[in-house]
From Swiss-Prot:
Further comment: Plants contain two types of GAPDH: cytosolic forms which participate in glycolysis and chloroplast forms which participate in photosynthesis. All the forms are encoded by distinct genes.
Species of origin: Oryza sativa subsp. japonica (Rice)
Gene: GAPC1
Descriptive protein name: Glyceraldehyde-3-phosphate dehydrogenase 1, cytosolic
Oligomeric form and interacting partners: Homotetramer.
Keyword Secreted: no
Site (Activates thiol group during catalysis): 181
InterPro entries for the chain: GlycerAld/Erythrose_P_DH, GlycerAld_3-P_DH_AS, GlycerAld_3-P_DH_cat, GlycerAld_3-P_DH_NAD(P)-bd, Glyceraldehyde-3-P_DH_1, NAD(P)-bd_dom_sf
Induction field: By gibberellin.
Similarity field: Belongs to the glyceraldehyde-3-phosphate dehydrogenase family.
GO biological process: glucose metabolic process; glycolytic process
PTM comment, free text: Phosphorylated after gibberellin treatment.
Length: 337
């Protein structure tokens, strides 16, 4: 199989990091980027310098002309087109398009990319109607006739593998999740208008902000056994990257906390290696910046009330881990064709 050729629509936090992952992958080739809101020289600057993930040092990045970037010696076509149905992906050779604008998240809107010659579209956000796949959980349900998929959210990618391991081994009766979540681009630097979410309009760098999240309910879509058994909420906190899930569950099969730890450790070394991590060191959030795993279980941070009621803690780099899964999902889709 030749290299998997991808295009990226929307060069924001996830778009740029997916580009970084692609450029460090031997089996994936980035051939095109579309963003109508930034010029090619600014795109170069934003790609090269990153406050959280550091300066790009893997290859030179240069501007060949207003419509072409050179990454090393490899040309990447740049478009600046607003309407997704007008982007000529086929011209650039892009077969898989990562839809990372955060705008075209339903099937109908994302399907516009197919008109320009894309074969498949991966939405880097939850979708109300596109099938959601979480690597390590339900990607085996993908079939080659599905053209538009969602990679779910970063939080669902952390929660679902952990929930799967617990449910497979001990059976989840019900559970509540809280994610303590780093700031994202939709928040405000200072208090500002946010008519749909009043709390969300408050200054991100100065507040702990309670917020809603569909991540726990979405687990029921990728693990139908857990449909209706999990829900959750979020606290947005003043850190720029790395979030942490607190999953509190009642389990059917009585188990000591040590037995639960052992099941997760075993999964992290076996089938879910690279998806689930396991740590026993006394780590804090910045220790996970740049960690490509979806869900890193913190054995020391969790606690059991009794053999049927337990709180589990898992870290995730909500930017880098998620961006790696976008590429992993594309790899899986390409293999399935």
């Amino acid at each position: 199989m030749g290299k998997i050729k991808i295009g990226i629509n929307g060069f924001g936090r996830i778009g740029r990091l997916v580009a970084r992952v692609a450029l460090q992958s031997e089996d994936v080739e980035l051939v095109a980027v579309n963003d109508p809101f930034i010029t090619t020289d600014y795109m170069t600057y934003m790609f090269k310098y990153d406050t959280v993930h550091g300066q790009w040092k893997h290859s030179d990045i240069k501007i060949k002309d207003s419509k072409t970037l050179l990454l090393g010696e490899k040309p990447v076509t740049v478009f600046g087109i607003r309407n997704p149905d007008e982007i000529p992906w086929a011209e650039a050779g892009a077969e898989y398009v990562v839809e990372s604008t955060g705008v075209f998240t339903d099937k109908e809107k994302a399907a516009a990319h197919l008109k320009g010659g894309a074969k498949k579209v991966v939405i880097s956000a939850p979708s109300k109607d596109a099938p959601m796949f979480v690597c390590g959980v339900n990607e085996d349900k993908y079939t080659s006739d599905i053209d538009i998929v969602s990679n779910a959210s970063c939080t669902t990618n952390c929660l679902a593998p952990l929930a799967k391991v617990i449910h497979d081994n001990f059976g989840i009766i019900e559970g509540l999740m809280t994610t303590v979540h780093a700031i994202t681009a939709t928040q405000k630097t200072v208090d500002g208008p946010s008519s749909k979410d009043w709390r969300g309009g408050r200054a991100a760098s100065f507040n702990i902000i309670p917020s809603s999240t569909g991540a726990a309910k979405a687990v029921g879509k990728v693990l139908p056994d857990l449909n209706g058994k999990l829900t959750g909420m979020s606290f947005r906190v003043p850190t720029v990257d790395v979030s942490v899930v607190d999953l509190t569950v009642r389990i059917e099969k009585a188990a000591s906390y040590d037995a639960i730890k052992s099941a997760i450790k075993s999964a992290s070394e076996g089938k879910l290696k690279g998806i689930i991590g396991y740590v026993e060191e006394d780590l804090v959030s910045t220790d996970f910046v740049g960690d490509s795993r979806s869900s890193i279980f913190d054995a020391k941070a969790g606690i059991a009330l009794n053999d049927n009621f337990v709180k589990l803690v898992a870290w995730y780099d909500n930017e880098w881990g998620y961006s790696n899964r976008v590429i992993d999902l594309i790899r899986h889709m390409a293999k399935t064709q």
